[in-house]
Amino acid sequence: MSAELEGVRVLIITSNSGVERDEIAVPRDRLRARGAHVTHAAVEEIDVHTYRHDLIPSETLRPDAALADVDPGAFDVLVIPGGTVNADKLRTDVGARELVRSVAAAGRPIAAICHGPWLLVEAAVVADRTLTSYPSLRTDLLNAGAAWVDEPVVRSDGDGWTLITSRNPDDLPDFVDAIAAELSVRTS
């Protein structure tokens, strides 16, 4: 294990179903390998069912906490995985929306991949930002006042916080590297 991100606290949030497996597992495992402490919080502190490509059942994960029980101020970055069902459920969760607003207001980075930016739309934090996502979210993001680009990873600064976005599981290496780079700058 590397000490590159030693002392850094990462919060990954999900619903309890429909999470794209690699979009939670890869950031969790790779950020831990770099020394970060990673906490997974779900809407409920019950099993989280993951899938591959939204359709193929995969692992069942046990979250570390329920969303309502985490203090967003205790973390250095918020990570939002995709999965169509996961993102759709998260964006309708009042606690998830409030958590996003709290993290942004505190000036901490938020990283979202694939369908994860749907939650950012509902939390009203994407206006005047440039970001990427799964292509089917493009219209929703544009309607929310964001600029959308088709790139593996996009970093966007504004309103005192940084937003990092990626399109899909193929972009995970770039996504994780961008998160690690942002955290390295903040902790150096």
What are these regions (language model features)?
Residues 1-106, 110, 118-130, 138-188:
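Extended, subdomain-level signal for the structured scaffold at the beginning of enzyme domains
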Residues 134:
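Active-site-adjacent substrate-recognition loops and nearby beta-strands
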Residues 114:
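Catalytic nucleophile serine of serine hydrolases
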